[in-house]
Amino acid sequence: MARSLKKGPFVDGHLMTKIEKLNETDKKQVVKTWSRRSTIFPQFIGHTIAVYDGRKHVPVFISEDMVGHKLGEFAPTRTYKGHASDDKKTRR
């Protein structure tokens, strides 16, 4: 179910304050966050946000196309290593 329009998009307060401070000083540095649930706002464009995937922080450079999506969409948590191969040919 989608979020109610009357509530508006969600972003963690600590993340928003960090980005606003960087925008005031015109600095571009990596911001570490564990908040995968935060929505990407237009203020984030041009910044690199390191999103935690459960093991490490994945650097995500924010572009215009990402606005409105969640940070967690760009840091996958699971690695797919493929299905087990069919060893019938090697058993002969």
From Swiss-Prot:
It holds the Pfam family Ribosomal_S19. Part of the 30S ribosomal subunit. GO terms for molecular function: rRNA binding; structural constituent of ribosome. HAMAP family: Ribosomal_uS19. The gene is rpsS. GO terms for cellular component: cytoplasm; small ribosomal subunit. NCBIfam families: rpsS_bact. GO terms for biological process: ribosomal small subunit assembly; translation. PROSITE patterns: RIBOSOMAL_S19. Belongs to the universal ribosomal protein uS19 family. Keywords: Ribonucleoprotein, Ribosomal protein, RNA-binding, rRNA-binding. The keyword Membrane does not apply. SUPFAM superfamilies: Ribosomal protein S19. Protein S19 forms a complex with S13 that binds strongly to the 16S ribosomal RNA. This is Small ribosomal subunit protein uS19.
